[in-house]
């Protein structure tokens, strides 16, 4: 039962990432860095910080939502691909900015989210 819930939550997170990514790409059609994945990862980290700070004792809910949904919503693999693509295109500065903003933003986002719930 937990495996099915985990798969469904991961699927929902992935579909939401796909939808939001398309919305962001339509809003910012030619960004200098991959803004959509960066925003999604920061937003997902922020929301995960809020979720973790709720202190939910139910291990199943924590795994399904924390790992399933947020694991499907955020994406380290696409972030890695995009950073390497920028490097391969000899856009070293853009890659460095993308990596720095995504990593600092995601960690800072998680911290900020975790601070919202005392």
Swiss-Prot record:
Keyword Zinc-finger in annotation: no
Membrane-protein topology: Multi-pass membrane protein
Gene Ontology molecular functions: fluoride channel activity; metal ion binding
Binding site for Na(+): 71, 74
Principal location listed in the UniProt entry: membrane
Membrane-spanning ranges: 1-21, 36-56, 61-81, 97-117
UniProt keyword annotations, A-Z: Cell membrane, Ion channel, Ion transport, Membrane, Metal-binding, Sodium, Transmembrane, Transmembrane helix, Transport
Activity regulation as described: Na(+) is not transported, but it plays an essential structural role and its presence is essential for fluoride channel function.
A Gene Ontology term for the protein's cellular component: plasma membrane
BP terms from Gene Ontology: cellular detoxification of fluoride
Compartment(s) where it occurs, according to its Swiss-Prot or TrEMBL record: Cell membrane
Catalytic reactions on record: fluoride(in) = fluoride(out)
Entry's family note: Belongs to the fluoride channel Fluc/FEX (TC 1.A.43) family.
Chain's role: Fluoride-specific ion channel. Important for reducing fluoride concentration in the cell, thus reducing its toxicity.
Family matches, as PANTHER family: FLUORIDE EXPORT PROTEIN 1-RELATED, FLUORIDE-SPECIFIC ION CHANNEL FLUC 2
UniProt-recorded name of the protein: Fluoride-specific ion channel FluC 1
Protein species of origin: Bacillus licheniformis (strain ATCC 14580 / DSM 13 / JCM 2505 / CCUG 7422 / NBRC 12200 / NCIMB 9375 / NCTC 10341 / NRRL NRS-1264 / Gibson 46)
Gene from which this protein is expressed: fluC1
């Amino acid at each position: 039962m937990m495996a099915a819930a985990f798969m469904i939550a991961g699927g929902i997170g992935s579909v939401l990432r796909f939808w939001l990514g398309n919305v962001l790409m339509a809003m910012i059609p030619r960004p200098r860095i991959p803004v959509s994945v960066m925003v999604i990862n920061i937003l997902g980290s922020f929301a995960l910080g809020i979720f973790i700070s709720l202190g939910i004792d139910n291990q199943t809910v924590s795994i399904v939502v924390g790992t399933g949904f947020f694991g499907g919503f955020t994406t380290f693999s696409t972030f890695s691909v995009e950073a390497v693509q920028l490097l391969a295109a000899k856009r070293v500065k853009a890659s460095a900015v993308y990596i720095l903003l995504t990593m600092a933003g995601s960690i800072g986002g998680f911290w900020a989210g975790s601070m919202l719930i005392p």
